[in-house]
Regions:
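Acidic, PIN/NYN-like endoribonuclease modules and their adjacent C-terminal/linker elements
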Residues: 1-3, 28-30, 102, 106-134
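Short, well-structured N-terminal submotif of metal-dependent ribonuclease cores
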Residues: 1-40, 52-63, 132-134
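Active-site neighborhoods of divalent-metal-dependent phosphate/nucleic-acid chemistry enzymes
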Residues: 72-118, 122
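Extended, non-globular alpha-helical segments
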Residues: 67-70
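Conserved glycosyltransferase catalytic-site signature
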Residues: 8, 42, 98-102
C-alpha cells in the first residue's frame, strides 16, 4: 500500500476541475492500486476551504467536503510541528505551510508527496513529485 500526500494545489486543481490539470490528476488517481491511500492534513483542508467560505460558495464547499470524506486525513502532532520547525531552520526559502506539509508527509511515512511546486523537490527529492510537469 502506498500513501500519497496531496498538496493543496493538487486537490484544488482536481476538485475545481482545472482545465489544464484535472484530467492529468484524474489519470494518476485512476492508476493507483486499490490499497493505495490519498492523504491530506487539516492544513490542506483549511487551504482548500478558505475561498469557498469567503465567497459563500456552498456548492464548491460541499465538493471539497465530499472529496475529503473519501480520503485519509493525517493528524498533525507536536512532533510534526517540531519537524517543520527544523525544516524551516534548515531551509531559508521554505515557508511555514510547506514545512508543515513536508513534515506531515515524512512523519506519516508517505511514499509520495504530489505537488506542482518545484521548490519542494530540492528539499525532499525522494518524496516530492511534481506530477504536473509535462
Amino acid at each position: 500500500m502506498s500513501k500519497i500526500y496531496l498538496d493543496a494545489c493538487i486537490v484544488i486543481y482536481f476538485v475545481e476541475k482545472h482545465l489544464a490539470y484535472a484530467s492529468k490528476i484524474e489519470a494518476l488517481i485512476n492508476n493507483l492500486g486499490m490499497n493505495d491511500a490519498l492523504c491530506f492534513s487539516p492544513l490542506i483542508r483549511l487551504e482548500c476551504l478558505v475561498m469557498p467560505l469567503r465567497t459563500n460558495d456552498t456548492t464548491l464547499q460541499n465538493l471539497y467536503e465530499s472529496f475529503f470524506k473519501t480520503q485519509k486525513m493525517l493528524e498533525m502532532t507536536v512532533e510534526i510541528f517540531d519537524k517543520a520547525t527544523q525544516l524551516r531552520a534548515d531551509f531559508n526559502s521554505l515557508k511555514t505551510p510547506d514545512a508543515l506539509h513536508l513534515a506531515t508527509a515524512l512523519h506519516h511515512n508517505c511514499d509520495e508527496f504530489w505537488t506542482n511546486d518545484n521548490r519542494l523537490n530540492s528539499i525532499a527529492p525522494s518524496l516530492v513529485k511534481n506530477v504536473l510537469i509535462t
